[in-house]
Amino acid sequence: MVTLNFEHIPVLLSETLEHLDLKQGGYYIDGTLGGAGHSAEIVKRIIPGGVLLGIDQDRDAINAAKKRLEAYKDNVIIAHGNFRDIKAIAQDSGLKEVDGILLDIGVSSHQLDENIRGFSYMHDGPLDMRMDTDCDYDASDILNNSSEREITRIIRDYGEEKWAARIAKFIIEERKSGRIDTTFKLVDIIKRAIPAAARREGGHPAKRTFQALRIAVNDELEVLEQAVRNATEILKPGGRLVIITFHSLEDRIVKRAFNNMERPCTCPPQLPVCVCGKEPLLKVITKKPVTAGEEELKANTRSKSAKLRAAERVSSKRS
């Protein structure tokens, strides 16, 4: 059994705690528990009497979080699952409504640093990228079984990679001589596909393709859309939803979802009053995303791309 190091610095920690508006004795959910960096600080502020539900689909993360939160075990519930199912998991855990929810989207430090998970283009390892290792389908399955058109679509749409078609073409050609099953083999293909001049622009040439594959393997964008809606449904009026994203695709989904639930009216603009009956569910707290300050950027380079958005439940109407 491989032991992973889950010690990491939680991003935007003080901003997260502030926007959750934590209350002693309150009920809260960390839908992306990870190594419990955020959760360890949340639970300190809600005891005595408070309850924290932590959810993660990574069993190694759950094991690490249990150890980290051992001192608060009477106030913590830990569940294995995908945060898209946050409503059902909360209700199964005895939490019908909660005072706040945190979703910290993206790959955690330990997943990037451990080559056995296949998330990183900086370490050689199996081309996996599954957040939940119970799933049968991984990144190598996509590359070795999908059509050139489908691979192009994934890399273009999820990675926003302008060389997507060329990379896909090289992948199809390479797999004729053998299965593409390691991260460094994919990195080599990407480097050969992207012209030399373009490889010197915008960081590591494999960054966008690896992001695209990770999103596709874990169905991340659809999961996020469902999670925002399901999380909102179990918030008490006045409860806070805080979401941290790490790339523009995720941030746009959160921004759009928040705006749609703040202004759900579908009446024609020429009508003097609303007749559709759709009530706002949320009030957006952060008109612009909160980003890391200079001090955090120096201490934790992975906070550079982090964006935090927060909203408050305003309606008691349930679906």
Name each region found by the language model.
Residues 1-319:
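S-adenosyl-L-methionine-dependent methyltransferase catalytic core, i.e., the SAM/SAH-binding region
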